[in-house]
Every structure is written in C-alpha cells, then in structure tokens.
Amino acid sequence: MTAEEVDKESDPAIEDVKSDYDAIELGNENENENEVVSLDSMKAVISRASSELKHENDQGEERDLGSVEKDPILERYHAACKQGDMKTLREMVESKVIDLSNDYDPKERVSGLHWACINNRLSAVKYLAGAGAEVNFKGGELDATPLHWASKSGLVYIVDELLKAGADPNITDSQGYNLLHTSVFSSNIMLVIYVLFFVVDGKEDVDQPDPHQRTALQWATYQADALTVENLLKFNADVKNADDAGFTALHWGTVKGSIPVMDLLIKHGSDFFQTTNDGKNCFTIGKELYSIGSLEASLYKNGFDKNGFPLPQYFSASTGKMLTFFLPWVLIPLVFYIFSKITFFIALLINTIVLVISGLVLSRLVVPSYLLSKRHPILNSPLLAGILSGTIAIAFFIWFTKISILTFTEKPVGNIIMLGFFIGLITLFIGLMKSDPGYIPGTVDHDKVRETIKELLSLGKFDAKHFCVHTWIRIPLRSKYDRDSACLISAFDHFCPWVYNQIGLLNHKLFYMFVVLLEISVWWFLPLMMEYFDELEDYLENRKGKHFGDCHFLGDEDLCFGLHHDTFNFLLLCWVIFQAFWVLCLIAVQTVQMLKGVTDYEFVQINKKLKSNGTTTEDIFSSTPPELMSEELIAELDAPALDPRQVPQRTCFTVCCTLLGLDKLVTMIKSVLRLKSDEPSSRSSHLSALARIPTDYGWKQNLKDFWLLPDTSSPLWRRILLPPKDSHALLNGMEVDYYTLYTLPNATEELV
C-alpha cells in the first residue's frame, strides 16, 4: 500500500454519497425526465466531497509525474517497518544509519512509524516510539499522524501503544478529523469502545464535529454501523445534532436504510419530522432513495405507524401476553368440540375460519401491545407456551372429571400416579416460565470496564469473541448474548418457545426433568384413556341399555369406540400423542448432548463449522498483532469467508421443523455419524481442532457435571433434584463459577 492509497481512504463516505446521488438521478431520468427528484440537501455534501476527491487525485497525479527514485536506505528501512523486521530495524536505528527525526521521504512525508502502525507491527511501534520517533508527526497528503493511520485501519493495539507513548488524540488531520472520527471510519467496534473509554470518557466531547459539523454519531449512522451507534448513544451522543446541510443522524440513517440503526436512533428520541436545510424530512429522503420501507419498519418497531404517529394500543403489555397465553386454552377444546359435533368437512371449514380470525385478532390487536416485530412473532410470543400448557390443562380437566371417575376402581394406583404427574408437570412448567436461566449482569462502572479492556489487551484477546460489546464485560466460556434481555446467559442452551424462556445454567436441569416427565405422562395417560373408553362402553351398555357392535377400524375396539362415541376425548388423545413424538425428539437430542457434555448452542456451532469447512459469517473484530495471536485465532482468521449462497434459507417448513425440534434431531444424527466415522478426514489440522468438543470429559463425568450440585455437604437427592441457585456448578468434577469461566478445568490451552 502506497502513501497515496492510504490517504485516499480518508473520507469513507465520499464515494458512497456520490453513488447514492448518481443512482437516484439516473433512476429518475429513466422513469420520467420531467420528474427528476431534487436532492439539494445532499448536493452541497456531494459537491464538496467530489471536489476534495478531485483535489486528492490531481495532487496524486502531479506527484507521480514528478516523482524521483527514492533513497534505497530509506526504502530498506520502510520495508523493515512494514514487515516488522526487528533485526533490520534495530541495526539501522542503532547504527545511526537512520535518523528517527528525519526518517521519511521529503515528498511523501510518511515516517517509518506511520508504516509500522498501519501494518499492525506492534513490536516495531514500541521500539520506534521508545527510541525517540515523533509520535505526533504529521505526514502524508492529509497531514495525518500515525495515530490517524492506525485508527482508520481499526488497529486497537497500535492505538493503545501510541497513546501510552504520548500521542495526542486531539490532533486533527487536514480534513479536521480527530481520533474518534477516524475510529468510527474503521467500523471496528473494539476500537470505538476503546476510544470511548480511554479518550472520550469524562475528557472529550463525544459530539465534537468535523469541519462540516458532522459528529461521530452521524458518520456511524451513514456507515450503517449499528454497534458503533449503540455504544455512542450509551455515551450520550446527541441524536438531534445537524450538520451544515441540516442532516441529523436519522437523516443519514435513512439514506443508508439500515433498520437496526434507525431503530436505535428512534428509541433515543430522534425527530423523524425534523427537516434539512431545504425542508426535507426523513420520509421525503426515504421516498427519494427507496429506503422508505426500512424507515417504516423502524417506526413500527418503536410503536409508530408509517406516517410517524403512535400506533393504537388496545391492551397493556401484561394483558396482551395473558390473552396470547390463554387463547389456546379456549381454542383447543373449541376445535375438538366442533369436530366432535359436526360433519368433518363442515367442521374443518368452521375451524379454519375460527383459527384465521383468531390469528388476525392476535397479530393485529393483541401481540403489538407487547411485541412490535414482524420477524417470527409467534416464536417470540407466549402462544406456543399457551398451546402446551392448555393441552396439559385440558388433559387434566378430562382426567379429573371423566377418566378418574370411571377408571379409579380398576386402576387406583395408575390414577394416583397420574395425579402426581399432573402436579409435577404444572409445578415444573410454572417454574420454568419464571426461572432465571443464568443471566450474567453487565456493568456500567467505567473503571471496571477499563480494567477488563486492559486485561484483554495484555492477553491479545480484545475482540468481540472475548469482550461483549453490548454489556461491556468479558465473555465467559459457554455463554451467549440474548438481545431480548440484553444480558449474557451462562451455559446457554437454547430458547424454548414452548416454555417461553431461555434455557441456560440455572434452569437446564429443570427443563430436562420437565420434558422427560411430559413424555412419561403421555404414555401413562394413554392406557388410562383406553380403559376409560372400555369402561364407558360397559357403562352405556349396562346402565343405559345401549348396545354397540364390534368395531375394528383402528385395530383396537376401545379406540374405535372412542372415535365414534366420544370423539372429543379421542381427538384429545391423538393430540396428546402427537405432542409426545416431538418431545421424544427433543429428549433424544438433549440426552446425547448431555452425554457429550455440550450445550445445544455449542453443538449447533460445532456442526456449522463442520458443514462449512470451518468458515464463519461472524466478525469478531480482531486487530490482534501477529506476535500476540494464538493458534486458534490464526486458524479462525485464516478460514475463508462463507459464501452467502451456502446459507440455507428459512421457509415455512424449516420453521415448523424448528418448532418441533426435528432439525436438531437430524443435525444430531448426522453429527454423531460424522464424529464416529473411521474414514480418514480430508480436513486441515486447524479445522479438526474446531470440530472437537472441549467440554466432553467422558459420559460418566458429563452426567455428574449435569446432575450434581457442587455442594458436597448437601444430601445426594438434593444435589440431583434441585437446580443451581447461583453461578457455581461442576465441570470435569471441579467447582467452577460460570460467570467468570475463562479457562476449562484441566484444559491444555486457554480457550477464552
């Protein structure tokens, strides 16, 4: 990379703004020459940006024409700085071959420290700064310091070292950009967070503008960088600041059409009716740039209609959730009743109408009272939990009012046990819905955050894999961030819509006990229902004088009798058995994962890496210098990017499979077969390392870790049956704190 190329990266939005403008003008010309959209509010920005860009290009051409051959000694020195060749660097500096106060070409004015910084050569930067290189030297066409060069490339470790060496973060380049601006240009959230905590916090103004009155927040919104926007807003960046064209952050967000960014800005009070200098609000800009759909979606998520007015709210959030939860308690018996009383096809038509109307009422009137999202609203509502609980409640009601009365004489023990099962199911279900899955509290103590950042920098692990950019804490092993609760969840397993809760460290044992008890209860309920049909037939024949002929349509006389003479309970039995099949799939997956010592989330991630040959779509924002990189990080960064075309698209069928757990069952079977295969693997060594399960300590130890509490003074039955009360649990037989779990017990290498 030449100095010219580095400098031309100075204003990342110049070409993008120009492209946006050209595209909209071209589109309007093609549609109707008389209806050219006016974007006067942006022309000033574009004109200025274009002239700056033209000026840079003209300068570059003039320099190329007038360039002379460079000093070979200086060339060798700069090459050593770029490559981090410490031996050559020391020889040239200590032998006085290179004068650090004059180590640049007079035409380029780019020092060796500049080159070491932009190439992420931490050792070279430390050496040069310690040897007396000027850390605030302004070089290149834009009079940028090494700090500017490093920050534009998102190099956190280099920025940290330069600041330690006395670099001034308040210096601006010739375009008027300070350290915060250039850090935002990099779109590296780790650098932005570092600058916010070590430079801005309590010292500088987070809204310090550039010469065109654009703040860091406005640049971040134009770049559609939701993570940077989120963190700037946490530092109280002003959403209402306008640049010299009258554009606020939301105006720039509308230009790019990023829903997450606009969502954040609207949540923090952005005025979508505020106009630019030529009188255009966000709605006008959205229509001109075809981003109006994204703006309307962002407004909807914040409770506004497409015109920016508050949506009508018919219920409070708690009432809406209650209605959603209890609706299946009414619909399930109603559907069964209609099928049991009316001819099948007419009943099917009526039930379809009932369900469609109920769905429309639910989605239009009820769900928006607590959930303003058009993406999988059913999965994120308590509806499925209502279906499961409603099924249990109806089954209990039928058992208590009909089955137990007719069958208690013949099966007293079975009915008493069934009562115990119902009590256990209801208790566990309520407990699961209200349980804490293991939320790890974040922090707002800036001193603690700075300590965490310093620690991770010293370990070479300050990236999004080890530091949570949302909660500002170090990420423990086996945890995952949950957007709904805005917390990390320890030993995260999965989100279960059937209990309307996340499953993690503190409730995973309860969840497994619940699904196993649910499966046992279904198969215990089946013979009681069969006995009920038999007793009902005898009762009607003996007491009512009715006679029923033989029926073998279903291969069982009792079932056939239930179909024809107690259709409601027959349909209930079929519905309950259907539930048992998907629960059985879930138990199978959970059991295998328990034996392997892995959570569902970890299991899915392992198999994604296996399926994609180690590729990943996740950006961990790592700028770790080569000398601090671990083998694991090198392998992860070297893996090729995943082709988006290889990512399976979600369809209605895949969503249904997800709800029933069938996708997990198929994945588990394929993964077990792959892991058990004796065929030679064609994968590289780093990929085979990704495929291993680091928490698999053998099935016996894995079972002990899952079921036993670490408190050895408690009775064994309490250790087995009770869930953890805090973050302490067993791992490889050792007590660990999952809130601060950064290494695995007896692990041969540090994984976090």
Curated annotation (Swiss-Prot):
Skewed-composition ranges (Basic and acidic residues): 9-21, 51-68
Record's subcellular location: Early endosome membrane; Golgi apparatus membrane
Gene Ontology CC: one annotated term: Golgi membrane
Alphabetic keyword roster: Acyltransferase, ANK repeat, Endosome, Golgi apparatus, Lipoprotein, Membrane, Palmitate, Repeat, Transferase, Transmembrane, Transmembrane helix
Topology in the lipid bilayer: Multi-pass membrane protein
Domains as described in the record: The DHHC domain is required for palmitoyltransferase activity.
Annotated protein name in UniProt: Palmitoyltransferase AKR1
Species assigned in the record: Kluyveromyces lactis (strain ATCC 8585 / CBS 2359 / DSM 70799 / NBRC 1267 / NRRL Y-1140 / WM37) (Yeast)
Gene: AKR1
